[in-house]
Amino acid sequence: MSGTAPAALEVAGVHVALRGKPVLRDLSLSLADGECRAIVGLNGAGKTTALRVILGMLRPDAGRVLLHGRDIASSPRDVWRRVGHLVERPFSYPELTARQNIEASIRLHGADPERTERAVQRMSEALALTGWLNMPARRLSLGTRQKVGLIGALAHEPDVVVLDEPTNGLDPLAVVGFRDLLREVTGRGGTVLVTGHHFDELTRIADRVDVLHRGRIIDTIVPEEPGRPGGTDLERAFFDAVLAADLAADSTVLESGAGPDARTEANRERTEVP
């Protein structure tokens, strides 16, 4: 009897509260092999917190995360070697060169830098980093360090890639090159999850775009989906979804008979989610 293959990445009913405030509420995602999915949201929507939970950096209050059917809470090191990630600011050792930082990341993922040398060179050319490979990281701009972090996340050919606003600080040429690198990942069956604010760019790289608002996924947008209100205009679809969610929340507060303090608290909650 053959069963259905598990999702490459599955997030099931995740709840997180920080300082007593709910940050993620019943977050659920399922990504297949070869899929690129994006999460978009306003500042404070919970995007980075979601990625930290997915990568095991933050333990949820409820729910679980599965990589290829295995709970990350009990996954062995080999499972994590198949994951590449870049969350928040790119880390680098200031005294090491860009190349040495990339090699250090490759070793941390259990790969051999000599075997990935061609991949590093190819990715460096795609992101216009070649001329800075031998420069100490302390002398690199934030955008150039972002390129170093991206190559460090991708060079060992991971099965699952998780990236937080990966195009931040990248020049237009590098953005195009990065897009091609993500297509390589999904082309060989890898799975990609990214967050971002650049709507046009997300429609170019993602098969689906989840709208995260106040810790919940309130809509899933499929770029170029026929007949969808807003069509391919992701920005319009995004703000329509956010406005509808806020109006529904306000209506719920009013129908419950709660006083003005409850509405004030609801409005504050929109801006205080980490």
Predicted segments with their positions:
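Conserved ABC ATPase "signature" region
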Residues: 103, 107, 115-132
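Catalytic Walker B motif of ABC-type/P-loop ATPase nucleotide-binding domains
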Residues: 161-165
